[in-house]
Swiss-Prot record:
One of its GO terms (cellular component) is nucleus. Residues 2-118 form the C2 B9-type domain. This is B9 domain-containing protein 2. The keyword Nucleus applies. Part of the tectonic-like complex (also named B9 complex). Interacts with TUBG1. One of its GO terms (biological process) is cilium assembly. It comes from Bos taurus (Bovine). PANTHER family: B9 DOMAIN-CONTAINING, B9 DOMAIN-CONTAINING PROTEIN 2. GO terms for molecular function: gamma-tubulin binding. It comes from the Eukaryota.
Length: 175
């Protein structure tokens, strides 16, 4: 089977109005993909930007996949959360990006968004925290479900991923 190695890091995030940010991440693939090593999901530590608005995470990603075809190429889905001084967490943004399909090192910028909710929910978010969240995480990368949502943009998550492709020519898989 053809193999894909994804090695890199979630470097951090910029452009969020909240501070004390952390990121929950996961990888989604099609049925023809098998994870040989690594973990499908994880979470960074909380970072409060000291200078500027960059939250630094430097969270490692190391995945090794085997596949029979290109359909269902891996996608990273991200959830950025903020934590207040009482330890309460609220959503700062959802985002996703496709893992690049060419070998080498890639710098990716993943824009994020969050559901707006009604004016009452927005008012409650401003004073109490919380706010609307998605019931199903599939809506993050499924455009068919996402177009009905009223959203606002969040910040940007910065990633650095290196890809190694192996045995694609041997198994007749063309990138």
């Amino acid at each position: 089977m053809a193999e894909v190695h994804v090695i890199g890091q979630i470097m951090g995030a910029t452009g969020f109005s909240e501070s004390s940010l952390f990121c929950k991440w996961g990888v989604h693939t099609g049925a023809a993909w098998k994870l040989l090593s690594g973990v499908r999901e994880g979470q960074t530590q909380v970072d409060t930007p000291q200078i500027g608005d960059m939250a630094y995470w430097s969270h490692p990603i190391d995945l090794h996949f085997a596949t029979k075809g290109l359909q269902g190429w891996p996608r990273l889905h991200l959830q950025v959360w903020s934590q207040d001084s009482f330890g309460r967490c609220q959503l700062a943004g959802y985002g996703f990006c496709h893992v690049p399909s060419s070998p080498g090192t890639h710098q990716l910028d993943c824009p994020t968004w969050r559901p707006l909710g009604s004016w009452r929910e927005q008012l409650a978010r401003a004073f109490v925290g919380g706010g609307p969240q998605l019931l199903h995480g599939d809506a993050i990368y499924s455009g068919a479900d996402r177009y009905r949502l009223h959203t606002t943009s969040g910040g940007t998550v910065h990633l650095e991923l290196s890809l190694l492709l192996r045995h694609f020519d041997r198994y007749g898989v063309e990138c």
